[in-house]
């Protein structure tokens, strides 16, 4: 379905500067293309953290994803453009309307949460402002898409689309979502890179935090054909990712930083493929 080669990213956040630098350097050594960071007041700010990451290793960096309601559109566009400039184009700007936890956080920063439509318009305004700031240098855009309106926006504006469904969504439904995206994108379809995030990879038992992340007990999640898991030997995992590329079109695979080493053999097996 897709002629794109695979690339791999690591999603995490720093607890200390030394630990963050070690993670970034290790990701680069293992062949990952990108270090990504989520956004939220419970975490360090992603923008200086990613600037630090880009300074310690020759690797791409990205927000995964910036919560639009936590900043004004002008502020977010300014931060994103600054990273594009400082990294010499190695920054990928992921932005979304914010997870439910961000509603209380907007109160803490003195900004309105807004309706779903207002938050979506905030994303659009941010992208428009970033385009003006970038000039001839264009920052790649990542958008998450699950519902019809988000899918339409992603089809029109995104370079990378992360298919935003929960851990229990059937494989057939995700494939249908990807097909709908390609239809909406029309002539842009081949220019859009499909991303898929993994909670876990390899053979280690799932940790307790996977219930918080997925809403499903680890044992139950293991019994499902969840696309947020990639289990088995390195060759089995590589074969499964090639099946996902063929049936869904996903070629940009991101993994939780806790599984950086577990996915590394797969990164090596699929290098250049």
Regions found by a protein language model. Give the residues of each.
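Active-site-adjacent structural elements that line small-molecule/cofactor binding pockets in enzymes
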Residues: 1-273
